Amino acid sequence: MLFRSVMSVKYSEDHAWVKVQDEDLVTIGITDFAQEQLGDLVYIELPKVGHECSRGDNISVIESVKSASDLVAPVSGEIVEVNDRLEDDPELVSEDLMDEVWFIKVKLSNPSELDELMNEETYQTFIGD
């Protein structure tokens, strides 16, 4: 088994960040890049706690004044917590993406999927920054 540092952050091609909390628990949100592309958010629909998601599933709807988008699951597992504050105040996403404003927490069913995500440097290259 490969060692993954607790609290490391990975990124998906769909512009989700994945913060590793421990060996089988991650917190997921959207990147600054995604939020900037969407603009002012007006609505977020979160999945239900207990929902099983597979990598690549659309798990959340994000609507902005510009467009609607889906949060695509970057990993597979059971959703164990959702950030209900986002449904009441979607504009929170633009304030502080990584520390306070997360979408869901997932108990991983396949931790090796984390190895397929990008590190910070690779993600910055991916978005052309």
Task: Locate predicted features.
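Short, small-residue-biased leader/transition segments that mark boundaries at the very start
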Residues: 1-2
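Short, flexible surface segments
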Residues: 14, 22, 48-49, 55, ...
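A structural signal for short beta-strand/turn segments enriched in small hydrophobics and glycine
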Residues: 50-65, 106
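Short, conserved beta-turn/loop elements at beta-strand boundaries and strand-helix junctions
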Residues: 20-23, 82-89, 113
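Short histidine-centered loop motifs in beta-beta connectors
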Residues: 37-38, 42-52, 72, 82-83
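Acidic/glycine-rich phosphate/pyrophosphate-binding loops and surrounding catalytic core
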Residues: 84, 92-129
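Short beta-strand-turn/beta-hairpin segments enriched in glycine/proline and small hydrophobics
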Residues: 20-40, 64, 69-71
